[in-house]
Amino acid sequence: NIRFAVSSLKPTEHRLEIKQSLAGSTLIDDAYNANPEGSIEALHVLSRFDNMKKVVITPGLIELGTREHDCNFALGLEAAKICDIIIFVGINRSAPLKEGAMSQHFPEDKLFVAASFKEAMEIYSGFADKNTVVLLENDLPDNYLN
């Protein structure tokens, strides 16, 4: 029976997978998403969490050739439209992301740049609570970050 088959399907890990996180917050784990369109759509999923503080943690997108700067600018811009707090990961990689967010006049005191995912989670832990939802978007290995 088709209904039974569909009901028994398991979501693909790290693809918009919803989990509990720090201090009772909600985590949208989209760590395996590394394409521009999918990353923007993941932010749109985040936007649907009404009455919650919205956070994104992302190193941006890589290996896009001449499109890389523009795609990361667009990701930062869209994050600024949706999020209350933004944490970019990678000191040297985050410039186009930050430019995009700042083009929307995102408050600088709500924008953080972490050197690693570990540091990003430490920053996040400072304001995580049951009314917070965080999107973990594209979990790059540390060798790409700086």
Task: Label the model's feature ranges.
Residues 3-146:
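ATP-dependent carboxylate-amine ligase
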